[in-house]
Amino acid sequence: INRRIAVTPASILLEPLPKTQAVAVAAARMLDRAAAAGEIDFIGGFGAHVQKGLTSSDENLMRSLPAALSRTQRVCSYFNMGSTRAGLNMTAVERFGHVLKELAFRSRTGIGCAKVAVFANVPEDNPFMAGAHHGAGEPDFAVNVGISGPGVVKAVVEQNPNCDLTELSEVIKRTVFKITRAGELIGKEVAHLLGVEFGIVDISLAATPRAGDSVAEIIEAMGVSRMGRPGTTAALALLIDAVKKGGAMASGHVGGLSGTFIPVSEDAGMIRAVRQGALSLEKLEALTSVCSVGMDMFAVPGSTPPDVLSAIIADELSIGIINNKTTSVRVIPVPGKRAGQIVHFGGLFGSAPIMPVSRKASKDFVIRRGRMPAPLQSLRN
């Protein structure tokens, strides 16, 4: 169990203060010390909502990010750069490619980039790092619970090798119902003991590097020969649908991301699929059209140009914007590493094979900047 806490977006807290890097870094270090004193593993919220533009505080926070995250251990950051209602802030996306490169080269493994995620349609009550923050519509305090539990789901899938897909969906739904009920019960009791409000249950299946705690292995237990091969997207869609239906029946307060995470470095099955050539960067992006969190915890060569990183972010966030869903990117350019090598982060972050990526991206498109208009489906009133 990891203890996590999230604060109001730091750009709001820093708005009345001097717009200097020293102030932003000092704020990050203060959060880091507070988390250490409270024995909190990660503290989120060092971020901003910039989907329509950047305030002076937002710009200062973004400039300060490499220094802030390289000088702290527990602080996590997020930036919401797009939404179905607002479109995509391509100016922020273009700048962020350079921020990621600088952040990566401040550590030997690029681990700082594992503590920052770029979002479209970010939820305000997400309990999972690195995107967790305490949204403007939240009460003073709230307890939000993430259920995780891929190992339990994998076990029940393996126990039902001969049922058809309708029956398989029912089995998964019943299992997630039980997990969600337990999570809500624990969350409400913790909230009661703390004297604060209970928020939501995030019913996401979230992998860890531990053996048997893999979302990819659920997909393989369903009959796909290896994660990433033909059939993977359909199996993942079935899994996510069953998870949502089971969780929604179990709790009246389902929120956060609530789907299925497919981080590369934190999932043993995903790592194996990449190393065996079954899962490419392009297939990972395709899977995010049905999964909840986007392209998560994947490593690319340290020589990857900033405009390529920005283009990857723009592609992924566009999927979320057009489909009115949350998507995100956590990409780690690893200094000195080439495609096919592996980097070890340790702990919850696991290890990641370096995935090949085209160095000839779309620089002329990325440097146009500006704001990509919101899609037609944003007009829903």
Model segments located where?
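Anaerobic metallocofactor- and corrinoid-dependent redox/one-carbon enzyme cores
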Residues: I1-N381
